[in-house]
Every structure is written in C-alpha cells, then in structure tokens.
A protein has these predicted regions:
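Conserved Walker A/P-loop ATP-binding site and its immediately adjacent core
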Residues: 35-69
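Inter-Walker segment of RecA-like/P-loop motor cores
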Residues: 62-103
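Structural recognition of the conserved hydrophobic beta-strand(s) that form the central parallel beta-sheet
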Residues: 46-47, 91-93, 113, 142-149
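Interdomain hinge/linker at the junction between the two RecA-like core domains of SF2 helicases
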Residues: 159-172
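Pre-Walker A adenine-sensing motif
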Residues: 1-20
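SF2 helicase catalytic motif II
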Residues: 106-143
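Residue-level preference for the first positions of well-ordered beta-strands
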Residues: 20-24, 43-45, 89-90, 111
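Walker A/P-loop
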Residues: 19-38
Length: 172
C-alpha cells in the first residue's frame, strides 16, 4: 500500500481532486470526500449504495443529475440531455444503475468515484448483481477512486483485485 499525506483544513479534506486509480481510505466520515468530486471541475460519476445518499446530495448540490429508481424512457431522455449540455457534469447513481449508465455515456469523459466501498464487500451476498456491475465496469472510466472511511476488509477479499494502489489518508 502506498501512503500519501493528505492535507486537511478544519477537519475537511483539502484537495482539488480525489486520488486516481486507487482505493482511498479517508479514515473518517463527513470529511468531504464526496464533496470534492461534486465541486471540482472534473466530470464525475459517483456510485453510491443507497437512494437516500443521492436524494441528500440532490437537495444541497446544483448541477447534479440523480440516477436511481426505475430507469424509465423519461429518465433516460433526461440523462442523455444532461450529458449533451456544455460544462462540467456530475451524475450520482446507485451501484445497480452503473452498468446502464455505462451504455449511455462516453465513460472516458468521466472519472468514477465509488463511495462507501466497504459496502461492496459487506453487501455482496444480497446485492451481487449490483456490485458485480460496479466491479465489471470501473476500469472503463478515465480514472476511478474507491473511497471508504475505515479499514473493513483486506484488498484481497475482493472478488477480483484490480486496484493499482491504495491510498490511506492520515491525520484526518
């Protein structure tokens, strides 16, 4: 594992972007990891385990497209319209929607943040289809960052160990 010293200010991560192509242990919750992806100037897909996380961010974030629930033609049209707009794009989806999203976008235009990475392992027994969709598609993106806030599993506990490196922030 490669350890990086990550700067923090007032208890929040002080970064322009998340580390790339890694598993990032941010050590504690609420320190702004997801917020970095939502506020920077990079196109991001943010995959999360629950709809509630998306709804929470939709209420507090401008220019965020939330992809959850039934994948209706109206939702698909809205997504396509959003991706064709000018400017930076931020799409937050549940784990199970990622494969459908990959079919509709140019993945190399986006970085992928897989939030609450520890849930991929904890929930595999009852969400294997959704989790396999994440694991089968994350390398399609410009870069990826699997983020979690505690050491809940060893890297080799993954279904497949594709990750190039792990980043452990200290002092946050």
């Amino acid at each position: 594992m490669i350890k990086y010293e990550i700067k923090e200010k007032d208890g929040y991560l002080d970064m322009i972007d998340l580390p790339h192509n890694c598993i990032f242990n941010k050590v504690r919750t609420g320190c702004g990891g997801t917020t970095i992806a939502l506020r920077n100037e990079e196109n991001y897909i943010i995959a999360v385990p629950t709809t509630e996380l998306i709804v929470n961010k939709l209420n507090s974030t401008e220019n965020l497209f939330g992809l959850y629930g039934d994948f209706t033609p109206t939702l698909k049209d809205g997504l396509i319209g959003y991706t064709q707009r000018d400017g930076v794009k931020k799409i937050m989806c549940t784990y199970d929607k990622l494969p459908k999203l990959v079919e509709l976008i140019n993945t190399t235009d986006y970085r992928l943040l897989v939030d609450e990475y520890h849930n991929l392992l904890k929930q595999y027994m009852f969400r294997s289809t959704a989790i396999n969709g994440v694991l089968d598609n994350f390398r399609e993106f410009k870069s990826f960052c699997f983020i979690f806030n505690k050491l809940t599993a060893r890297l080799d506990d993954c279904r497949t160990n594709h990750h190039d490196r792990a980043v452990n922030s200290r002092g946050i």
